[in-house]
Amino acid sequence: MKHWKKMAASLIAISTMVAVVPTTYAMESEDSQPQTTDTATVQTTKAAEPTLLASWDFTGKNGTTNSAIADSTGKYNLTLKDGAKIEQYGDRSNNEALSLRGDGQYAQIDDQLFKDAGDSFTLEFASKTRHDDSGKFFSFIVGKDGSNDANTTDQANANKYLMFYNSKTAIKGVISNNNWGNEQGSKVTVSGNDNSWADYKIVVDGTNLAVFRNNALIIFKANTGIKMSDLGATTAYIGKSFYSVDEYWNGAMDDIKVYRGADLTMPTAVAISGTGVVNNKLTLIEKDSTKLTATVTPDDAVSKNVTWSSSDESVAKVAADGTVTGVKAGTATITATTELGGVKAELPVTVEPMNAQNAAAADLDAAIAALKVPAAENLPLVAKGTKNGSAITWKSSDEKLITSTNEKYENRTTGADDPYRGAGIINRPAYGDGDSKPVTLTATASYNGGEKVTKTIEVTVKEKTRIAPDTGYAAVTFESDSNGGEKAWVASTEKNDFFTFKTRNNGQAVLTNDADTGGLRDMFVLRSHEGDKYYLIATDLKVSSMGWSQNQVNGSRKVEVYESTDMMNWTRTNGDGNGGITINTPNAGMTWAPEAYWDDDLNAYVVFFSSRMFTDDTRTTPVKNDKTGNSSYAQVRYAITRDFVNFTEPQMWQDTGYSRIDSTVRKIGGYYYRFTKNEQGGAAGDYITTGKSIFLERSKVLTAPTTEASPGQDPNTGWQLLEQALLPFEGPETIKLNKDDELNTKDDDGYILLSDNFAYRAFMTTGAELSKTTWDNPMTKRYPDFNNEKKPVKAEPGAQGYITQGANGGLPDKVRHGAFVNVPESVLKVTKSWTAANPTHIEAVDSTTKAVYNAGTRELTATVTSADKGTLAGSVKFSAGDWSKTVKLDAEGKATVTLPASVSGTVAVAYDGYTDGLVNPSDTTVDGIEQGKVDLAELNKQIAAAEALKESDYTADSWAKLAAALKTAKAALAAENQGEVDTAAADLKTAIEALQKAPTNPGEGDGDKGDGNKPTTPTTGDKTNVNKPGSALSNTGTAVLGLGGAVVALAIAGISLTLWRKRRA
């Protein structure tokens, strides 16, 4: 074979081989000398030289079409079909080549060729492609063209094939024994492939598959589990797919050669090195990490990939990239195993204990650094350190503003335990009251019961935000799988009518992923629990560049998370420029269709997503289940967050052994309702029998795990299956209709359910109808055509079923899986005006101030309203001439003042807005105010009552307070302000009631305290001393005499007590 080095095809019995790190060193002491061990001699057997079976170079065949062309041996034919022909190519020195232009053109190779090639063969050819990366064609395929290409449940009749795919931007090579469901291999992105020739080689060696491009290995899959003989047939096409709906390839192929036998150079040895590796050993401190490198020989081995493993992950764990981390004190062995051949090297690792104080301090530093201040959301006051796992407790200086750790917290019997143990729940001051005073949080950490470390941080709690009624809707969707279609488009309604969506930003995308895979799909948007902002969380996925298979293993490892106050101006929650956030574990191959919902029990958000799990961090062997034909499947996991920056470790949420994806949640009454797609092509257990459709469950515990789909589940502790196949296909979403949407019900119970059936479909219902749904009383029993797209119902309050309203059903024209959210008028306006060239922001809404004057009470009440009917904060200033008074608005937007009697004419009433600038000022005036008359009746009554009393009857202190109040009251007789008069009367009355009687017997008690009796007020008609100020003054000598007598009596009593005690002694 030209251009390819002939090397050994396999290794046999290499268990005696010793790599640079022998296992015999694992328990060697530090004082001992390392053993000298010769590297084991690797015995290799040179495979028989690959034998040429057939070749076509098409020389002299220019113009041939619709006929058979024999190979160089004359034994096998390549037959041109439906317009396929041989053409000369100037970019290939005018060589003739097989030319396929789509439109049904293809070539077929005799079945016998690949039957003769057997389980190990090599295919070489030159090729160019003119085909976009649509994912819907095959360039070359050999195997069984089955009668079932619609699902993966009927494996006996499924397509089974070895396939090569050549597009302008990607190459794919896979082998499968069950349609797309078990494709083994991968798809890779390549450059310079558009209409350009390249040399390719496909090598199949038993269950090993390799694809080379221009002599470079681009795809390799060891141990596919599928041999060519497992495919059941050897039908071979160039340019035609086994799938009836696929396209025909647009490309060319030349110099086709098929050999019996494989030509793969196998690894012969592997050695481990890295920082800290000394004498073939590694020592780490707990929580420390170091990067290991595996060197595979020979240099031209077909695969130098290795998988890493640990003999004890509780002591030392190792990531897929070779980073080893000490977990706890002890010993373990790290092993590197070649992907091909299973050649191993082992490295003994000793993990020494960490210093408890340093460990605790590191955990505290990380926990405090994670806090976003000032606080507008509950704080992630973790009970367990994220670095080292220290136990952390938090103490708040003001429990009314921020809660402390609940030291009596007990783990829940079902669902997630609170990772914050009651700490960090904030109580924001009311809108208009301003931010809180600083609260001191004291965090105390202890690592493994060691020395406690304490640190503090001051946190200000922000006042509540302004809230306005929702008067429209917004949506965020993506367009398609094609290049340029995996971005976020924003649409919004023209008015408060759900079926009036229009794509904004002149039809262009609003948000593009500038990091990671570069794609955004399956967006979900929710308003924050406190209402300040919107969060957007999306799948990091670009099918157009990486394909589906690779993205389920090595792509889609993060989620892209953004926040915005107006749905158009988005920033990353973790800071622009930082890319996505990894919330999944290293052994999870994808993080798809993320959504979130508020958990009332955890006081936090629960973020859930689908993942295909693997047995270890290398993500080479998927977790399989015999329920699905022993194939991998998608599970749904969740993590908890309070800020969409810091997430807890993910936990299993839904693992029934069958593929699930696209869960969305809505709480109605006391239940969470969960809509999820059955990703299986058919049944998923005993109850869900319809594949690729959406089923409904409910539970009172959002994070309760699901291991079985059953109507018999207790919804108090798990998820109860209510209905299968409620909605078609995938991407379910729900939204509650706005209160004033004309399609809403009178009791404000209208809902829209949506599903992505290759474009969004809308179904109307109510919360009451969803709540009625049970397995025995499903929605489709009560409304048989509920999900029948051929029988739409009229859009009206209380409608039940499929709605179609004009173009796209009145829904966004960017039709793929996204999210829908209610928005107030201020946000709706931004969505309509915003463009990338001229990004707008929320503008202040107008306000109106009205004032009503009550001449009888002289009260002037101002009422401020906003154009969007939202909440208000700030103050109203009342002014006339030299007089003014500023009064804070109450919760209803009102402020009241009592006008002084001297104020007359016109009073100005002005609302100045608030510090957040969200509402414009407004003002008004009140004319015709007449000067007030002061009513002195009550004041004179209280003065008369006070002057009727005798000072000698009361204690000195209480009488002094009365005298002061009386003086103020008499001064108020000349006041022009009724309020001043009323206050003086009230204060005088209070002083009278507070008088304390003087003791009548000098030996009784303390004269300053009196006997506690209340004074007797004059009877009606007694005018003595009324309005005679001098008559209220008493003879102070009387009071002094009474006090002196009390002192003498006390002295005598003291002497008597002393003499009595002496006698007793």
Swiss-Prot record:
pH dependence (UniProt free text): Optimum pH is 5.5 with larch arabinogalactan as substrate.
Residues making up the signal peptide according to the UniProt record: 1-26
Cellular localisation: Cell membrane
Biased amino acid composition, Polar residues: 1014-1031
BIG2 domain sequence ranges: 277-346
GO molecular function annotation: alpha-L-arabinofuranosidase activity
Keywords from the named record: Carbohydrate metabolism, Cell membrane, Glycosidase, Hydrolase, Membrane, Signal, Transmembrane, Transmembrane helix
Record's function text: Involved in the type II arabinogalactan (AG) side chains degradation. Releases arabinofuranose (Araf) from alpha-1,3-Araf-substituted beta-1,6-galactooligosaccharides. Can use radish root AGP, larch AG and arabinan. Shows weaker activity with gum arabic and arabinoxylan.
Protein name (Swiss-Prot/TrEMBL): Alpha-L-arabinofuranosidase
Biological source species: Bifidobacterium longum subsp. longum (strain ATCC 15707 / DSM 20219 / JCM 1217 / NCTC 11818 / E194b)
Taxonomic classification: Bacteria, Bacillati, Actinomycetota, Actinomycetes, Bifidobacteriales
Gene symbol of the encoding locus: blArafA
